[in-house]
C-alpha cells in the first residue's frame, strides 16, 4: 500500500486473496479502479510511491507459490509494465520505501525460491541498480521499511531471518547501512507494518507476529530509540497489514492483515 500525494489517495493492490484489483481510498471510501491490464494476481508484492515522478511502483510478489520479478508503475489511470536492463532476482515478502531526499525507490531482502535474501536495490531513471555495501542487515523476509523524512534515512525493522524472528533496527543513508543500538525496541517479529508519520516526525510501527503470536502493539521511533504508544483500543492483533501515511488527512492508514481467525478487511486511521 502507498499514498499518492499528487492525487491524495491511498493505493492498494493484490494481497493474500491473490486478486488483481487496484483499490484507492480517498479518506471516505475504498473504490476499485478498472483498467485494461495490470500486474495480475499475486501475494507478497511490495509498493512505494515515487513522488518525484508521480507514480506508484510495484515489484515482485508470488503467483501460485512462484516468486516474481516484474516491475510495474501505476499513474492513476493505467498500470504500465517497465522493462529494465537489470532487475532484482524474483522474490516475495521483500520491503520497499521511497527515499524522497534522493528520489529513489529502495528495495531490501525478501524470499526467493532458494531462501532468504539480504541484498539492497535502488530503482530510479527507469532502471534497477544493486547497492554494494560493506555490511548491512542479514538476510530476511517479512520485514518492514519506511523513509524517515526528518532524518533523511531509510529505516528497517525486524523480519523473519534464517534462524527465526528478528528485532533489529537499521538505517540506510544511501551510502551505507548502520545498525541502531536502541535502548528500547519492539519484540522480535515478522510481518509488522511501518510508516513515517509526518505530523509527529516519527516512524510508527504496528503489529506483526512473534512465533505463532499475533501482536497489536504500537511503537514510535524518533531516530535513536523506540517508545511504545498506548492510544486507547488498537486494531485487533494481526500480521501483514497494509500501512501508509496519508499526508493530506494527516493520518496513518491501516488495512487488513492476517488475524488470529484469518484474513481481515477492516480500515483504521491513527492520528
Where do the model's predicted regions map?
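Kelch-like beta-propeller repeat domains
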Residues: 1-271
Amino acid at each position: 500500500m502507498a499514498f499518492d500525494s499528487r492525487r491524495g489517495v491511498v493505493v492498494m493492490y493484490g494481497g493474500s486473496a491473490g486478486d488483481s484489483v487496484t483499490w484507492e481510498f480517498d479518506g471516505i471510501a475504498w473504490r476499485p479502479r478498472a483498467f485494461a491490464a495490470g500486474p495480475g494476481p499475486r501475494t507478497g508484492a511490495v509498493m512505494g510511491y515515487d513522488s518525484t515522478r508521480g507514480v506508484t511502483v510495484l515489484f515482485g510478489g508470488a503467483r501460485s507459490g512462484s516468486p516474481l520479478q516484474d516491475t510495474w508503475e501505476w499513474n492513476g489511470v493505467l498500470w504500465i509494465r517497465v522493462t529494465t536492463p537489470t532487475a532484482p532476482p524474483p522474490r516475495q515478502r521483500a520491503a520497499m520505501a521511497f527515499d524522497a531526499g534522493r528520489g529513489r525507490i529502495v528495495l531490501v531482502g525478501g524470499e526467493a525460491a532458494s531462501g532468504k535474501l539480504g541484498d539492497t536495490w535502488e530503482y530510479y531513471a527507469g532502471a534497477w541498480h544493486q547497492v554494494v555495501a560493506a555490511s548491512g542487515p542479514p538476510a530476511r523476509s517479512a520485514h518492514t521499511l519506511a523513509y524517515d523524512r526528518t532524518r533523511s534515512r531509510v529505516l528497517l525493522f525486524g523480519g523473519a531471518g534464517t534462524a527465526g524472528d528478528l528485532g533489529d533496527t537499521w538505517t540506510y543513508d544511501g551510502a551505507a547501512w548502520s545498525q541502531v543500538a536502541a535502548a528500547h525496541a519492539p519484540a522480535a517479529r515478522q510481518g509488522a507494518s511501518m510508516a513515517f508519520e509526518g505530523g509527529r516526525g516519527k516512524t510508527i510501527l504496528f503489529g506483526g507476529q512473534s512465533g505463532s503470536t499475533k501482536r497489536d502493539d504500537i511503537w514510535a521511533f524518533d531516530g535513536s530509540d523506540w517508545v511504545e504508544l498506548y492510544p486507547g483500543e488498537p486494531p485487533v492483533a494481526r500480521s501483514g497489514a497494509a500501512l501508509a501515511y496519508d499526508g493530506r488527512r494527516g493520518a496513518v492508514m491501516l488495512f487488513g492483515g492476517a488475524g488470529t481467525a484469518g484474513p481481515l478487511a477492516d480500515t483504521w486511521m491513527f492520528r
